[in-house]
């Protein structure tokens, strides 16, 4: 029995030339999109590899600098070293070169200044006491006034010392004190003053530095100086601090004086404090009628044997200046002992009697040293003097101390870089891009 065969209907297949062309174009478009996306993805991967490698290279910051001074730097970072480290961290099959770089010493230490201020703002929350704020506000005018007062005192001492009798004459005593080493007058134990010193000629503030090419940066506001000083007082020690041995014992004094030795810097700071105190003390004497009367009485006594008319008033003025100078020496003594001295004196905080001025600096001196709880201590006066210094000098001298303590070259420390990278992708496609990294 024959099986019946079922016929399957056949269809005729055909496509127009237009449709075929359209289909080819669609395939080409999809292929181009896929290729473009693939190339862009490869670019993104290369750029991500570069960013990651650059961040990893700068993650090799100097740990000792961070631990001691809370400053981030990449030490000894030449393009050769940077290229090697970036290859190690995966930025391979590319060429890199530095477009711009910034070093810690650039722009007179502005890079260091920015990091120090940022640290103080984030972690210290420094706020000046009323006494320190008053000192910072009036210290410039005090120093200007002191220059005039000092000139007046020198003139009057030169004029009147020869004509007045030596016996019972405080002006002769003050003339002798001004020619005496200040440290021996204000320190209870001059032999215990540190004699440590450094060689300043090879330090950043004096030598020719390697310079980056990032260019100038925007300077901070006036309030940032308070934060810089807060950073300094936390990371650098002064006479009244006790820490492990460093290149210099009196680091804050070096920031103010800039001399190679501790002794020279301490003497310079004592002179500056003496200047501020003398102007303030003289200003107070001009308001105290009782003390002016005392000076006038002594002036009459000293001038009783002279026949020069009008000299009594001149001698009185000289005695007031000399008295202010003697009181200022006592003030500095009090500060070096760790006690406090008020910015503005009163009759209750005045320490040196005019009758005892002649004995100052001798074994017979009689001085009532007063610790004023509401005043400023030595650190407070140093902080006020630091506020008067320009930030460039403070920054560069801070870098001097960092180099001396850590034995590194701060102008070889990189803090910011912009690199240009060139990558060759498949089919000869090239990609050039830049990457920037900065410690923040």
Predicted regions and their residues:
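Alpha-helical assembly-interface signal, strongest on the long, hydrophobic N-terminal helix that forms
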Residues: 2-81
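Long, compositionally biased low-complexity segments
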Residues: 70-440
